[in-house]
Amino acid sequence: MEIESAATSGESFTSVTSKKSRKRRAAEERPMDMGEQPSKRPDFPPISGDKLMGDKDEMRKIPVPSHRYTPLKENWMKIFTPIVEHLQLQVRFNLKSRNVEIKTCKETTDVGALTKAADFVRAFILGFQVEDALALVRLDDLFLESFEVTDVKPLKGDHLSRAIGRIAGKGGKTKFTIENVTKTRIVLADSKIHIMGSFQNIKMARTAICNLILGSPPSKVYGNIRAVASRAADRF
């Protein structure tokens, strides 16, 4: 037999190593040089505020209607202080164009500071108290929404006046109730309605106001918004 003759002759099988195993063994035997190996993740150093804002200074202009000149003058320091000290922006009231002008500078570090300041001033111009409008600077999830009574229902004359009266209530009771339950702030300026709050809260307040405009009695509206508010509280 051939197999028996090969075994008796003392011949043995030769092991063959593949190219991959040879390369792997050579890589393991080679000393590790940590300095030459590139890092797996790119390392980007933080950008300074002035580079992030760019070379050009940005500016926002907020027009001021004539009936808000006096309140703006009386509350100027309350508006000026948080914009300059907290947001590191420049602000002035242009007497010629009747605009509040807000501008970035070298000290400005926050990219969204200009938008926050513009929303803060715009909220005050719309009729919100300075203390309430200041929440737009401190918190990120607050928004402004404006609409007119005629957007919900085309009313005129006495019908429009009655709809506005239903929203306000006797001595402002209805408006205050909606504000407290939905945790929003509401301003009634003639037929315009301005709401400030978080997205969900604005939605609840808007639904309640629309129901009042469409003719729902206040007691029914109170019950609906309280039920929605309690469901939202349970959800979170």
UniProtKB/Swiss-Prot annotation:
Residue stretches in coiled coil: none
Disulfide bond annotation, renumbered to this chain: none
InterPro entries registered for this protein in UniProt: KH-I_PNO1_first (IPR055212), KH_dom (IPR004087), KH_dom_type_1_sf (IPR036612), KH_PNO1_2nd (IPR055211), KRR1-like_KH1 (IPR041174)
Biased segments, Polar residues type: 1-17
Family of the protein in this entry: Belongs to the PNO1 family.
Single biological process term from Gene Ontology: ribosomal small subunit biogenesis
Region (Disordered) residue spans: 1-65
KH domain sequence ranges: 152-209
CC annotations in GO: nucleolus; nucleus; small-subunit processome
Keyword set includes Methyltransferase: no
GO MF annotation terms: RNA binding
Chief location of this protein within or outside the cell: nucleus
Function in brief: Part of the small subunit (SSU) processome, first precursor of the small eukaryotic ribosomal subunit. During the assembly of the SSU processome in the nucleolus, many ribosome biogenesis factors, an RNA chaperone and ribosomal proteins associate with the nascent pre-rRNA and work in concert to generate RNA folding, modifications, rearrangements and cleavage as well as targeted degradation of pre-ribosomal RNA by the RNA exosome. Positively regulates dimethylation of two adjacent adenosines in the loop of a conserved hairpin near the 3'-end of 18S rRNA.
Keyword set, alphabetical order: Nucleus, RNA-binding
Protein name as annotated: RNA-binding protein PNO1
CDD domains on file: KH-I_PNO1_rpt1, KH-I_PNO1_rpt2
Biased composition, class Basic and acidic residues, residue ranges: 26-43, 52-61
Subunit structure: Part of the small subunit (SSU) processome, composed of more than 70 proteins and the RNA chaperone small nucleolar RNA (snoRNA) U3.
Localisation: Nucleus, Nucleolus
Lineage: superkingdom: Eukaryota
Keyword Nucleus among UniProt keywords: yes
